[in-house]
Amino acid sequence: MWNRAAAAACLALAACRAQPSEPQFPAAHRDVAPTVSDTFSTEDARDRVGEAEQVMELAGVKPGMSVADVGAGEGYYTVRLARVVGPRGRVLAEDIVPEVRDELSDRVQRERLDNVAVKLGTADNPMLPTTSFDRLFLVHMYHEVQSPYAFLWHLRDGVKPDGLIVVVEANRPVKQHGMPANVLRCEFAALGMQPVKAAMLSSGENYLKAFRIAAPRPSPDKIQTC
């Protein structure tokens, strides 16, 4: 009996040791903004600025598309994307804070958004299904990503071959909760993604950049940092 138990323990230990370790990614050579409240502004105030409508139009969001709202927070973009893609489309809303995810799930159920799913990711991996989305949206959140190379390495798996990753940021220093456009472009280029659209938004200092996968994903130890 002891021999069987010992053998089972050895097999379990060997299996644990055989599991591949998480790859090691280079650190960001820039500031990272602290995470702030997911309440960016009142929704009425944001609607008055009209940013969401402008962003969705520039990004080419259409009925029937599959889109992801990464770092969805309270779901401001989530619910508006759901309306545009319609019943034939799908929206995945992701956040890394369990309480925020739960509150967003409640909102989705309360507003009967049948085309929206909500999931929990991690700080460096949004856990997106592979090659599933026509558009991935990162809205006013990329400056808070602590491990951008790991995050982008995992993120790009979720976009379809002809899909776009759409970033909205403020053109100001990271410590002021913005992202200089040249830094954004460099970090995306390090993961094989190139910009195909850029625009300043009507709100003034905010900009949009849309990226497409242009090269194979490098292994973590081959990433050329900015």
What are these regions (language model features)?
Residues 13-15:
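C-terminal motif of bacterial Sec signal peptides marking the signal peptidase cleavage site
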Residues 63-64, 87-88, 159-165:
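Short glycine-dipeptide loop
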Residues 134-148:
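A short SAM/SAH-binding and catalytic strip from SAM-dependent methyltransferases
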Residues 17-68, 76, 106:
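Class I SAM-dependent transferase core
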Residues 68, 73-126:
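Class I SAM-dependent methyltransferase SAM/SAH-binding core
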Residues 200-226:
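Core SAM-dependent methyltransferase catalytic element
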Residues 82-83, 149-164:
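A short glycine-rich, Lys/Arg-flanked "PGG" loop and its adjoining helix->strand segment in the class I
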Residues 124-136:
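A short acidic, Gly/Pro-enriched loop at the edge of an enzyme's catalytic core
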